[in-house]
């Protein structure tokens, strides 16, 4: 099968990590152009050393690039605000956009949960790094029982957070919380991000707390174990940090402020899941699991899109 050409907009940490993945591990897609706005950026310099065409004049420079017509998929790893502008500029050209910012113009996609549901959408959103790590766990619990409330805490090394991530903290929490509900299946969702300043940096760690009623503990454990294996198939450094924990909290009134006062039955239990994500160190060191899970998930979507396009052509 011939490969599908792609472009990456954004030459920061996420964009550069994605470019290296496209060079080293992609099967059905190939990088044609890396787009940035700073001619001196490390990402553009690395791409040039790899023999990849670069543009330092933003999305307009991409549109004017001689290979633009051959490009079918465009990753945007800039910022939520920039993606709004980029998507508008690219809309007339019918390209598939994979949005790695919290802009969320299009539907949320978490490959382990709903990869096949939105492949026809012109612009799909990869939620956030914290969402990619934790929403599969919320969805795994939701398969077994109703999740009345889910809260996630994503702790990432400060050194792995570039200016785009730092500019999008509010969007991170809002987008992740919505996706916990829409993709994860929780009735109510909340997200918190922590930029850990520890030096040497620690790998990404994520906590998922879910409120459920009368849980089948063995079934929930098995569902979570199965989901971790599904995610680890494309993010090898993704794993449970310790055993899933169950804590009885009492009556529904004890958590009414979190569940909107809904009648959720008693007793209410808290399910606690602790994860860590070790990066593949394609660009930043292994502590940057937040980059790895985001770019690996986006690559999964691109590979699936390329497969679907090839099948359509073959018919």
From Swiss-Prot:
Concerning Gene3D superfamilies, the annotation shows: Dihydrodipicolinate Reductase, domain 2, NAD(P)-binding Rossmann-like Domain
Q: Which CDD domains match?
A: ALDH_C
Q: What is its EC number?
A: 1.2.1.10
Q: Which domain of life is it from?
A: Bacteria
In the record, biological process GO terms are:
catabolic process
Into which EC class is this enzyme placed? oxidoreductase
Q: Which Pfam families match?
A: AcetDehyd-dimer, Semialdhyde_dh
Similarity section: Belongs to the acetaldehyde dehydrogenase family.
The entry's protein name is Acetaldehyde dehydrogenase 1
Q: Which species is this UniProt entry from?
A: Rhodococcus jostii (strain RHA1)
């Amino acid at each position: 099968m011939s490969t599908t050409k792609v472009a990456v907009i954004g030459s920061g940490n996420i964009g550069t990590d994605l470019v290296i993945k496209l060079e080293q591990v992609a099967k059905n897609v190939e990088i044609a152009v890396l787009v940035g706005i700073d001619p001196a950026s490390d990402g553009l310099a690395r791409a040039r050393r790899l023999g990849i065409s670069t543009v330092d004049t933003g999305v307009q420079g991409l549109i004017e690039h001689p290979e633009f017509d051959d490009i079918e998929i465009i990753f945007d790893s800039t910022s939520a605000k920039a993606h709004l502008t980029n998507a508008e500029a690219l809309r007339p050209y019918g390209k598939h956009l994979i949005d790695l910012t919290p802009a969320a113009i299009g539907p949320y996609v978490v490959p382990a949960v709903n990869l096949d549901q939105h492949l026809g959408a012109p612009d799909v959103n990869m939620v956030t790094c914290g969402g990619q790590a934790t929403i599969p766990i919320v969805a795994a619990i939701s398969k077994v029982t109703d999740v009345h409330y889910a809260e996630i805490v994503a702790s990432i090394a400060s050194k792995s957070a570039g200016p785009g991530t730092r500019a999008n903290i509010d969007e991170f929490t809002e987008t992740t919380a919505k996706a916990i509900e829409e993709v994860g299946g929780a009735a109510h969702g909340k997200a918190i991000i922590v930029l850990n300043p520890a030096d040497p940096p620690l790998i990404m760690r994520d906590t998922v707390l879910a409120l459920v009623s009368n849980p089948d503990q063995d079934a929930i454990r098995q569902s979570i174990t199965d989901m971790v294996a599904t995610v680890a198939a494309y993010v090898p450094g993704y794993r449970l940090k310790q055993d899933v924990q169950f804590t009885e909290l009492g009556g529904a009134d004890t958590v009414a402020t979190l569940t909107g006062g809904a009648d959720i039955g008693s007793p209410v239990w808290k399910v606690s899941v602790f994860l860590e994500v070790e990066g593949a160190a394609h660009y930043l060191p292994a502590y940057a699991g937040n980059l790895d899970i985001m770019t690996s998930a986006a690559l999964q979507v691109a590979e699936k899109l390329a497969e679907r396009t090839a099948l359509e052509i073959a018919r």
